[in-house]
Design a protein with these regions (language model features):
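Alpha/beta-hydrolase superfamily serine-hydrolase fold, recognizing
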Residues: 17-218
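N-terminal Sec-pathway targeting helices
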Residues: 1-17
């Protein structure tokens, strides 16, 4: 009995110490990836075109980041950030640090909003894919107006945004050729039985509602 009590005390102590050390790390370091990509930004670094419209029914917009010193006689390349948030939260502002970072590496970058499931707009992944494709068309037009030719792009995103980035990369409908895609923690398997938590978050009451959100088909 005493041995079991000692083991229990050791386990509890380990958990407490682990949680405290993790909390201290977060307080001292913050979000490590964000800190690694944080850059100083001013007019000498580049120009930001904020809150530009693209074709969609729900007033979604995009932000465009143009690094200074790009040669307009040469091909340029775009990195498009698509925010995550379980398809029901997040915004293009989530990609600000990423866009600024990659802009300092010489890439034109952009971050886009899309219709979220909780906005009551009958959103589906099909609609989100369509909106992002429209955003790419508009970004292409805007950069051409500014005198840049984008020869290729890389969509990227986190979680739900990563899924949408892969959809853009592989559905073959991008107005700008996709050279590669990169993402973090993007789901690729959407059987309702594996997504009970997402169904709760998105307040979906049945598998039929889940399929509707995924496909847009009633």
């Amino acid at each position: 009995m005493k041995k079991k009590t000692k083991i229990l005390i050791y386990v509890i102590t380990f958990i407490v110490v682990f949680l405290i050390s993790a909390l201290i790390r977060i307080m001292l370091l913050g979000s490590a990836p964000e800190r690694l990509i944080k850059v100083e930004w001013d007019e000498s670094v580049g120009e930001i075109y904020s809150n530009h419209d693209y074709e969609n029914d729900n007033v979604n917009q995009y932000d465009l980041y143009i690094p200074s010193g790009l040669d307009k006689s040469e091909n340029q390349y775009l990195i498009l950030f698509i925010h995550g948030g379980s398809f029901n939260s997040g915004s293009k502002e989530d990609g600000e640090s990423w866009c600024k970072y990659y802009a300092t590496k010489g890439y034109i970058t952009a971050s886009v909003d899309y219709t979220l499931q909780n906005q009551g707009k009958d959103a589906s992944i099909y609609l989100m894919n369509e909106e992002i494709e429209n955003a790419v068309k508009t970004i292409k037009q805007k950069t051409e107006e500014l005198g840049y030719h984008i020869a290729g792009m890389a969509p990227c995103g986190v979680s739900a945004g990563g899924t949408l980035a892969m959809n853009l990369a592989y559905n073959g409908n991008s107005a700008i050729p996709v050279k590669f895609v990169f993402q973090l923690a993007a789901p690729t398997y959407f059987a309702p039985s594996e997504w009970s938590l997402l169904m709760k978050v998105d307040r979906l009451n049945s598998e039929e509602e889940f399929y509707k959100m995924m496909t847009g088909i009633h």
